[in-house]
A protein has these predicted regions:
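P-loop NTPase Walker
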Residues: 1-40, 140, 194, 223-226
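Helicase P-loop NTPase motor core
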Residues: 204-207, 212-306, 332-334, 396-397
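Short glycine-/polar-rich loops that comprise or flank the Walker A/P-loop
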Residues: 17-20, 171-174, 180-182, 203-208, ...
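Proline-centered turn/helix-capping motifs that create local helix->coil transitions or kinks
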Residues: 87, 173, 228-238, 399, ...
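Conserved helicase NTPase motor core
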Residues: 21, 46-50, 54, 96-198, ...
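Short, polar/flexible loop-turn hinges at active-site or ligand-entry regions and domain interfaces
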Residues: 12-19, 35-47, 57-70, 86-97, ...
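Conserved beta-strand -> loop -> alpha-helix junction used to position metal-binding or nucleic-acid-contacting
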Residues: 17-32, 303-327
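Conserved helicase C-terminal RecA-like lobe
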Residues: 95, 297-298, 327-522
């Protein structure tokens, strides 16, 4: 908003421009709340406290994997989606919790904020909408202050923002919006291009101006983007023209797997840097999900090519399902790792109670203590002895075969299927993580070597993220790359089931927009 204000002021000498309010929905709405309901900066719940609070709520409800950062993040996103859509929480289908669990977590989170006298960023929108809807004096005052409204990136607004906008703009309807439904890729956050497409139904006498020239990309790229996006049905019919002429190259490759793909890209970039005297910062590798960055990180580290990860520093190895498999491997290397024994002893379920685990959690010989100090049924004893034998076998395998053995012979995949069935959620995402983890172990001879590699990767990514001066190839997701531009772009994993992604809310349209935007980025 500061950038937009400075640009506006540079284009006009009218002193009244200084009186214009510039801001995001959150900042403008929070200003309204501060005026009418006496909120202040101290009222805002910071993200760290929010995550800690939700983590404690999940643990208090004995929800499995409550410590997992990705699970916590997913729950945060789902609560946000429900609020931004003005949904009844009972109608929402969570991808990580059962319906009952989600409702309980939602309610406890609301109580948690009330006890702390805090609001989060979603509340800024909800509470402003409710204020304007229920308080005529407040609505009239806001209308008198904001008689003219301009909204940029209108394709990205959500339901609560749109409903509040309609209240403020009515009855004069002096509203000017700029947007492109072809660039709406945030459906998972509640953004809806429908509000742009149906704008004329809500605001009469609308005048529409088509901005159909792209000044960023060359003709070859624009043509491909047009051919892709025209397959969408939920859009205004238009053909984007090129304002840059021709001269770009668009190449396609068909690698056998993610490793071969990463090696090809790494070699291609290295050759271009050496031959053309370009910089590593001139290159970006863009992917649909963070999981896909795993092979890139491995290969670029091995080839000593500098890179910058723009998204979360959480790696595939941090996911709870991957951590379960790695716990099995760590036990193979160190059978005295009680923490890892406790993690996997009931994955799959082996009917060992929490009381028994608490009784022996600090014992030096976990398995012997479990058998001899706990009151186990003979069938349980046999199960534990069989597990001990299996672990001894696993430690002699190479890591890829060891992971395969854990998934099949030790029934970890069956545990995942049961876990998803009990929660009525799809298995695709978790199986994808396990497949990628198994693939990551391909080139290692011993489990110890593989585990050491994982620690190096995690350390490298943390250092990479903390080093603000790192010069290197950009690794980023499509969503994080929106609005940026690069000289050379590689889009990886353009496979059915990845782009469009199986978990996508609007597979037919929104995922084509991802590809179209990435094509135009070059």
């Amino acid at each position: 908003s500061i950038e937009k204000k400075n640009r506006a002021l540079s284009l006009s000498n009218d002193f009244r421009m200084n009186k214009v309010t510039y801001g995001t929905f959150h900042s403008v709405f929070f200003r309204i709340l501060r005026y009418f309901e006496n909120y202040n900066i101290e009222s805002i719940l910071d993200e760290k406290t929010k995550r800690i609070g939700l983590k404690n709520i999940l643990k208090g409800l004995n929800i499995e994997n409550a410590d997992d950062d990705e699970t916590i993040g997913q729950v945060i996103n789902e609560i946000s989606y429900v609020k931004n859509e003005l949904m009844d929480k009972r109608d929402f289908k969570s991808e990580v919790l059962t319906n009952d669990e989600f409702i309980k977590v939602y309610n406890f989170y609301e109580e948690y904020k009330q006890q702390m006298n805090k609001i989060d960023f979603d509340d800024m929108l909800i509470k402003t909408y409710e204020l304007l809807k229920n308080n005529k004096a407040a609505l009239d005052r806001v209308r008198s202050v904001y008689r003219y409204i301009l909204v940029d990136e209108f394709q990205d607004i959500n339901k609560v923002q749109f409903e509040a906008l309609k209240l403020i703009a009515n009855p004069s309807n002096n509203i000017f919006v700029v947007g492109d439904e072809d660039q709406s890729i945030y459906g998972f956050r509640g953004s809806r291009p429908d509000f742009l497409l149906e704008f004329e139904e809500y605001f009469s006498n609308t005048k529409k101006v088509l901005l159909d020239i792209n000044y960023r990309s060359k003709g070859e790229i624009i043509n491909i983007a047009n051919r892709l996006i025209e397959k969408n049905t939920n859009r205004y019919e238009k053909v984007i023209k090129c304002g840059q002429g021709n001269g770009a190259k668009v190449n396609y490759i068909s690698p056998e797997d993610s490793e071969e793909e990463a090696v090809y890209i790494a070699k291609d970039i290295k050759n271009k840097v050496q031959e053309d005297y370009t910089e590593y910062t001139d290159f970006a590798v863009i992917y649909r999900t963070n999981i896909q960055s795993r092979a890139l990180v491995d290969v670029f580290m091995d080839m000593r090519i500098p890179f910058v990860v723009k998204d979360s520093i959480v790696t595939i190895y941090d996911h709870w399902a991957a951590q379960d498999i790695l716990a099995y491997l760590r036990i193979g290397v160190n059978p005295n790792s009680n923490k890892d024994w406790i993690r996997i002893i009931n994955k799959p379920f082996r009917y060992i109670s929490k009381d028994n685990l608490n009784l022996i959690k600090d014992e030096p010989d976990f398995i012997n203590s479990l058998i001899n100090k706990c009151d186990l049924h003979p069938k349980q004893v046999k199960t534990i002895n069989d597990l001990d034998i299996d672990i001894s076998y696993v430690k002699g395998l190479n890591p890829k075969n060891a992971i395969s053995y854990i998934r099949t012979t030790l029934d970890y995949d069956r545990y995942i299927l049961d876990y998803c069935a009990n929660r009525k959620i799809k298995t695709n995402g978790l199986i994808e993580i396990l497949n990628e983890l198994e693939s990551s172990a391909t080139n290692f001879k011993t489990i110890q070597e593989y585990l050491e590699h994982i620690e190096r990767v995690k350390s490298e990514i943390v250092d990479n993220k903390n080093n603000k001066e790192t010069d290197g190839v950009i690794f980023t997701t499509m969503h994080s790359a929106k609005g940026l531009e690069f000289k050379n772009v590689y889009i990886i994993g353009a496979n059915e089931g990845t782009i469009p992604h199986e978990k996508s809310y609007e597979i037919d349209d929104e995922e084509k927009k991802n590809d179209q935007i990435e094509e135009e980025r070059r």
